[in-house]
């Protein structure tokens, strides 16, 4: 029950998330006169702000940083009078219309439609020794923390785009960069693999077919990692270093919506298909876009595209259900 004394704000459309999907949804829905309200969440700009170089954004032949791109999107959405709130939604009820959302400031909101674009968060290895050193030598962001390891030895764990981007970035700061990957081959883009292999002539050292068993350190932080390699005669070996950067993928931020929306492996299920309304969830009026629905492509541009589709789907839903003149 909501007490009558509480002030409840009502909006046609509320967008959760401030990555490429969220901001693109805001731009399109604002142009449709839906007057969207966007909650940035705690991770303003999404995980893209930690990307040092984006070389595949159409129209930008010269690379730009993730922060630059997200600032552009933020400013674009704001210029169209999107109301942007730097808070997080901590509770939702999608079973009643209008939909109810509660922020971390205990402000209540209702909405005719919601677009979920809450993105994903970095995964950790799950080691007991890892959790002790988060912020003390264990990091998930080379752009954020790489500076602290100038002329020191570090490791990057992973084999995808993020891992190779982190390794390449750190190779310009650290003395040595150990790239530890559980497989023998990398899943990153070919151009990144080529650049990384070229850097093996300098200061990137490959440890493929290896897993991290333990992160070793003391009161002053990380001192090394213990790894097990398939082709190692000793099987286990210790690498002395000062920092470990984890880049093994991301998990969608969808916990808030469990028991209300249909999911598979924590990814929100949407209609897809060829008949439109592709971003709708199992609840009409609730749409999802970006990394919360995509475990395959995981690109800024595909997130942005799905944000566009979600806005168009929401516009059609609101127009048909409520008859707004858009």
Curated annotation (Swiss-Prot):
GO biological process: removal of superoxide radicals
Keywords: Cytoplasm, Disulfide bond, FAD, Flavoprotein, NADP, Oxidoreductase, Redox-active center
InterPro entries noted in UniProt: FAD/NAD-bd_sf (IPR036188), FAD/NAD-binding_dom (IPR023753), Ferredoxin-NADP_redctase_2 (IPR050097), Pyr_nucl-diS_OxRdtase_2_AS (IPR008255), Thioredox_Rdtase (IPR005982)
Superkingdom of the source species: Bacteria
Signal sequence coordinates: none
Catalytic activity, EC: 1.8.1.9
Record's GO cellular component terms: cytoplasm
Disulfide bonds: 141-144
Subunit text: Homodimer.
Family stated for the protein in its record: Belongs to the class-II pyridine nucleotide-disulfide oxidoreductase family.
Name of the featured protein: Thioredoxin reductase
Organism listed in the record: Buchnera aphidicola subsp. Baizongia pistaciae (strain Bp)
């Amino acid at each position: 029950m909501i007490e009558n004394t509480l002030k409840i704000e009502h909006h046609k459309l509320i967008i959760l998330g401030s990555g490429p999907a969220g901001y693109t949804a805001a731009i399109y829905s604002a142009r449709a006169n839906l007057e969207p309200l966007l909650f940035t969440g705690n991770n303003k700009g999404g995980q893209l702000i930690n990307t040092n170089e984006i070389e595949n954004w159409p129209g930008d032949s010269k690379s730009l940083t993730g922060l630059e791109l997200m600032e552009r999107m933020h400013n674009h959405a704001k210029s169209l009078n999107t109301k942007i709130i730097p808070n997080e939604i901590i509770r939702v009820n999608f079973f009643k219309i209008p939909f109810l959302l509660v922020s971390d400031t205990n402000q209540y909101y209702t909405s005719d439609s919601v677009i979920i674009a809450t993105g994903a968060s970095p995964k950790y290895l799950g080691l007991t020794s890892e959790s002790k050193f988060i912020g003390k030598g264990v990091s998930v962001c080379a752009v954020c923390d790489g500076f602290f390891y100038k002329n020191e030895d570090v490791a990057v764990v992973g084999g995808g785009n993020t891992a190779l981007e982190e390794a390449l970035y750190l190779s310009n700061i650290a003395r040595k960069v150990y790239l530890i990957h559980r497989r023998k081959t990398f899943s990153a883009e070919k151009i990144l693999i080529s650049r990384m292999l070229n850097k093996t002539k300098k200061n990137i050292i490959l440890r493929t077919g290896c897993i991290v068993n333990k992160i070793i350190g003391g009161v002053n932080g990380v001192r090394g990692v213990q790894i097990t390699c398939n082709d190692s005669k000793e099987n286990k070996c210790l690498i002395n270093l000062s920092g470990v950067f984890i880049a093994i993928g991301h998990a969608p931020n969808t916990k808030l919506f469990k028991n209300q929306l249909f999911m598979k492996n924590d990814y929100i299920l949407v209609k897809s298909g060829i008949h439109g309304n592709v971003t709708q969830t199992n609840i009409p009026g609730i749409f999802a876009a970006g990394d919360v629905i995509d475990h395959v492509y995981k690109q800024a541009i595909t997130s942005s595209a799905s944000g566009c589709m979600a806005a168009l789907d929401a516009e059609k839903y609101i127009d048909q259900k409520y008859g707004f003149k858009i």
